[in-house]
Regions:
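A cross-kingdom feature marking solvent-exposed beta-strand/loop segments within repeated
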Residues: 66-85, 174-188
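Compact, well-ordered interaction domains used in eukaryotic information-processing assemblies
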Residues: 70-76, 80-106, 110
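Heptad-repeat coiled-coil amphipathic alpha-helices that mediate oligomerization/assembly
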Residues: 2-23
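OB-fold ssDNA-binding interfaces and closely related basic DNA-contact patches used
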Residues: 21-61, 94, 106-108, 117-140
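Short, solvent-exposed interaction modules
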Residues: 116-185
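A short, structured beta-strand/loop element
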Residues: 51-74, 157-172
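Short glycine-rich, low-complexity/disordered patches
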Residues: 98-127, 209-224
Length: 224
């Protein structure tokens, strides 16, 4: 192979390498942007955390992911996802920032009960019997109930409790949980008053930004 041809091959190899590096860089940027958008709030404890994600904004839902992990191995022990309608999430955020939920929590805490009752809870939800069967999630034919609530905490002002139980779909399609026994999954995430406010602000700002972007990009029904 003569010298000129070798130089040309080296030049082509260099160009291909530059293109490959560019593609990898763009993919990395794309991944970073996706992570930033999809995961917009997080509350952590020593062995649990709750993340709030925008993955399901396109279907009008906010995704709350709860995880419990082993502190030594840092591996996940239990996890569950709960979906909330956007408008319900906005109402939840407003109830926090307006002081309604903190006031209810203070009133409940003042009763002096060892285990204060929840002052707020998500609507009944989960996976119905048909989908459970299709996905092979249970062998008893029951639905899966998933919800979480917020109550006054012991060491922290507030604690989120996410629970999964067997359930049954009612005539309205809501999944009624069975309370005759311990939950199959239970994950608690305690938080401070400031963390709760930050969560509410993040929910509001991200949903409002998403909806504003829909209007800006004309991503709405124009047939009316």
């Amino acid at each position: 192979m003569d010298k000129e041809m070798q130089q040309q091959l080296n030049f082509i190899d260099k160009r291909l390498q530059n293109i490959e590096n560019y593609v990898k860089k763009q993919e990395s940027i794309k991944t970073q942007r996706k992570t930033l958008v999809n995961e917009f709030a997080e509350i952590n404890t020593l062995d649990t955390f709750m993340k709030v994600k925008a993955n399901t904004f396109n279907i009008g839902k906010v995704l709350f992911s709860f995880v419990k992990f082993d502190k030594k191995t840092m591996k996940s022990i239990e996890s569950m996802d709960v979906y909330m309608d956007m408008d319900d999430a906005l109402l939840f955020a407003n109830d926090i920032l307006s002081g309604r939920i903190p006031t209810l929590a203070a009133t409940e805490k003042a009763k002096g009960e060892k285990y204060p009752k929840a002052v707020w809870s998500t609507k009944l939800g989960g996976i119905n019997e048909k989908k459970v069967k299709e996905r092979g999630l249970r062998e008893d034919g029951k639905a899966i109930s998933r919800l979480f609530n917020l109550a006054p905490g012991a060491r922290q002002p507030f604690v989120f409790t996410a629970e999964q139980r067997p359930g049954k779909s009612d005539e309205k399609g809501l999944i009624q949980p069975e309370y005759n026994g311990r939950p199959e999954i239970q994950i608690r995430v305690a938080c401070s008053a400031d963390d709760l406010k930050k969560l509410a602000i993040s929910i509001q700002s991200n949903i409002n930004a998403y909806r504003a972007a829909q209007y800006a990009n004309k991503e709405f029904d124009t047939t009316w």
